[in-house]
């Protein structure tokens, strides 16, 4: 599931003698804290314990762990839903700097639909498929985040592996932003284990065009380095973007072996900054990535 918009993780520390709680972003640092927003809705699905909080025009979709920790999956400004509030989601859009010509894209993991809202605004001609395994997430995204299918966007309730095994038109970009409540079927960050194998990466490659790109939202955990090595072994070229002061790394895996020089990326980023309506600076993303 999206993380998107995805992917922030917050740990809610509750103590008997502590009045209040600290909320830590999934992809944030231990120093991040914010006042808890009121709970607006709560539901359990077959995959996750889902909670929605709202503060004025900002609505947040969270997963709740077994010990009560809250994990932010999406955050939307209801007045301007196309604005990406979570930093990691902006870094995922560096895909446009690496592969500027995008006609078809796939998002694995819906969450609250932040990426859907952004791409409708930023690239309205883009043909977009979104695969989400949890039907409750799809319903919640519709009812609370106005994230639903339209003429250029399909939302498919299916496991991503099964979807990608089917025949279909190739994608220019695939965004991997799938997270569930942590379980024996996921890694420590909530990524389904069957979406991390060498076999899965081969299936993904088969659904890309020859110059296609896969963008992974990775959370730093005990096997983080192994995750990057597995992606590096499967794809001809990778680009890494560490999100400043956060616990996540965006890895863009390209089918094109030749490396794009930093000067080329910077030039493309400057062109997007001048001509697009992203609401953030692509050059700033490249400059601040670590």
Region locations from a protein language model:
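Hydrophobic membrane-insertion alpha-helices, especially the h-region
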Residues: 11-23
């Amino acid at each position: 599931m999206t993380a998107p918009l995805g992917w922030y993780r917050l740990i809610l520390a509750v103590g008997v003698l502590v009045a209040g709680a600290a909320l830590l972003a999934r992809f944030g640092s231990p120093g991040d804290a914010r006042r808890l927003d009121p709970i607006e809705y709560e539901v359990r699905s077959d995959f996750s314990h889902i909670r929605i909080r709202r503060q004025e025009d900002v609505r947040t979709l969270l997963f709740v762990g077994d010990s009560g920790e809250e994990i932010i999956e999406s955050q939307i400004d209801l007045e301007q839903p196309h604005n990406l509030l979570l930093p990691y989601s902006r870094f995922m859009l560096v895909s446009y700097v690496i592969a500027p010509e995008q006609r078809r894209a796939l998002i694995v993991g819906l969450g609250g639909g932040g990426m859907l809202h952004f791409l409708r605004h930023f690239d309205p001609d883009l043909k977009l498929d979104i695969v989400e395994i949890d039907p409750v997430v799809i319903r919640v995204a519709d009812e609370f985040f106005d994230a639903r299918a339209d003429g250029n966007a399909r939302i498919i309730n299916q496991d991503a592996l099964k979807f990608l095994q089917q025949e279909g038109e190739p994608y220019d970009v695939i965004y991997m932003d799938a997270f569930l409540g942590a379980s024996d079927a996921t890694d420590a960050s909530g990524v389904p284990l069957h979406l991390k194998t060498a076999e899965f990466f081969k299936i993904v490659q088969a659904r890309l065009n020859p110059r296609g790109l896969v963008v992974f939202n990775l959370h730093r955990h005990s096997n983080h380095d192994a995750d990057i090595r597995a992606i590096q072994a499967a794809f001809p070229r990778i680009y890494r973007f560490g999100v400043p002061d956060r616990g996540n790394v965006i890895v863009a895996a390209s089918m094109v072996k030749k490396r794009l020089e930093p000067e080329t990326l910077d030039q493309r980023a400057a062109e997007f900054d001048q001509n697009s309506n992203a609401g953030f600076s692509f050059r700033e993303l490249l400059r601040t990535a670590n």
